[in-house]
Amino acid sequence: MNYSNPSQLQAAILDWAGTVVDFGSFAPTQIFVEAFAEFDVQVSIEEARGPMGMGKWDHIRTLCDLPEVAERYRKVFGRTPTDADVTAIYERFMPLQIEKIAEHSALIPGALEVIAKLRGQGIKIGSCSGYPKQVMDKVVTLAATNGYTADHVVATDEVPNGRPWPAQALANVIALGIDDVAACVKIDDTVPGILEGRRAGMWTVALTCSGNALGLTYEGYRALASDTLASERKRIHKLFEASRPHYLIDTIADLPQVIADINQRLARGEMPQGN
């Protein structure tokens, strides 16, 4: 048997919040702030957004490792946060997240149309998230009522290591029956999500305006003056630079042109690992 490069995409692995649902990725961000507040520790929205894309326990651990947050915690408890303290915050985060996830469950404009177009081209729709399964089950149910169902879903606690490790993306490859990771594209609004796709050997598309990096509602994004939007794009492109996404676009609505370009590159023999 001989190896031959794939000639076209077989699967798109989509993130959830900030990619397909919850424009601006507000659901997890606000709950991190509220969970810490229940321990009398202040965390700003900006701080909470920093590690977005990681599994939620790891996200809280990363926040607790910030010198400023660790010092605020020490002033309240007389020590810096241990892993047991992180778990206590996580266990408060979970019910808050489940309770309030519906408030930020709307599909991102253009998502349904783009996903239908991908399926029309024979592309399977995988998905993964920094949410644990308990939260994802509710997110998936809410999305289904709005017309979106992925072919496969992998939550962060269903693999040994979440993002930026490649396990969730690769679990989709296995479940969807894809024969080559180079025939897959990972779409995400966070750096850990892009690193996940890169490390899995996939094409990667960073979404700059619908998710965590811009952090605005759809209406807020649409209302930005052209020079402000250009400045924000430049800032966000720099944030993603080290993770080396193959493409950067505003939102999932811009994805069809990218899919067409990747298929052309595959047909020419190009591979994601070589770019």
Curated annotation (Swiss-Prot):
Binds 1 Mg(2+) ion per subunit. Its EC number is 3.11.1.1. One of its GO terms (molecular function) is phosphonoacetaldehyde hydrolase activity. Its cofactor is Mg(2+). InterPro entries: HAD-like_hydrolase_sf, HAD-like_sf, HAD-SF_hydro_IA, HAD_sf, PGP-like_dom2, Phosphonoacetald_hydro. The active site is at D15, K56. Mg(2+) binds at D15, A17, D189. SUPFAM superfamilies: HAD-like. One of its GO terms (cellular component) is cytosol. It catalyses: phosphonoacetaldehyde + H2O = acetaldehyde + phosphate + H(+). It comes from the Bacteria. Keywords: Hydrolase, Magnesium, Metal-binding, Schiff base. The keyword tRNA-binding does not apply. CDD domains: HAD_PHN. GO terms for biological process: DNA repair; organic phosphonate catabolic process. The keyword Transcription regulation does not apply. Homodimer. Belongs to the HAD-like hydrolase superfamily. PhnX family. Involved in phosphonate degradation. This is Phosphonoacetaldehyde hydrolase. It comes from Pseudomonas fluorescens (strain ATCC BAA-477 / NRRL B-23932 / Pf-5).
